[in-house]
Amino acid sequence: MIKLIVGLGNPGAEYTATRHNAGFWLIDQLAREAGTTLRDERRFHGFYAKARLHGEEVHLLEPQTYMNRSGQSVVALAQFFKILPDQILVAHDELDLPPGTVKLKLGGGSGGHNGLKDITAHLSSQQYWRLRIGIGHPRDLIPESARAGAKPDVANFVLKPPRREEQDVIDASIERALAVMPMVVKGELDRATMQLHRN
């Protein structure tokens, strides 16, 4: 059963619309659905709300530590409420999936994502759930003929807003993720994964 849903992103208005904040977009939607408001909670180093989602009590968190220190926020809340790693779902932007794709998985490496890297270090475990929200990779924007020697600027890419057509399909993928949340919060994660990956 998932007791904590974390969305990753960077704090501040200048980052709100950037690809790296896709995790925040999901949490904002969940809070709206639950009719709750995230509030600044200093002991958890983030914006936090306790929500009732589909009959289950769930903690929602948006770390305000900047991406590469997200673990500090996650572990503070997890320890306070005695939440185990496999009861945590982390929603994050995923370079290795095209915009419009969203996938659930338990465990695994960080794939170069600094937020995941820091969470893994703070939890001393990789065994937490991830909701991977595809944002695409900057190499996909380079014509194939020019890709051979090109070095795409990933840091710049994730800190820019998606193009309009990308934003539309990312929003649609978040809607699909929201549709499986009743299963997620009830602990039916295999079923949720199958449904999400079918689409």
Swiss-Prot record:
PROSITE patterns: PEPT_TRNA_HYDROL_1, PEPT_TRNA_HYDROL_2. Keywords: Cytoplasm, Hydrolase, RNA-binding, tRNA-binding. GO terms for cellular component: cytoplasm. One of its GO terms (molecular function) is peptidyl-tRNA hydrolase activity. CDD domains: PTH. One of its GO terms (biological process) is rescue of stalled ribosome. Hydrolyzes ribosome-free peptidyl-tRNAs (with 1 or more amino acids incorporated), which drop off the ribosome during protein synthesis, or as a result of ribosome stalling. Catalyzes the release of premature peptidyl moieties from peptidyl-tRNA molecules trapped in stalled 50S ribosomal subunits, and thus maintains levels of free tRNAs and 50S ribosomes. This is Peptidyl-tRNA hydrolase.
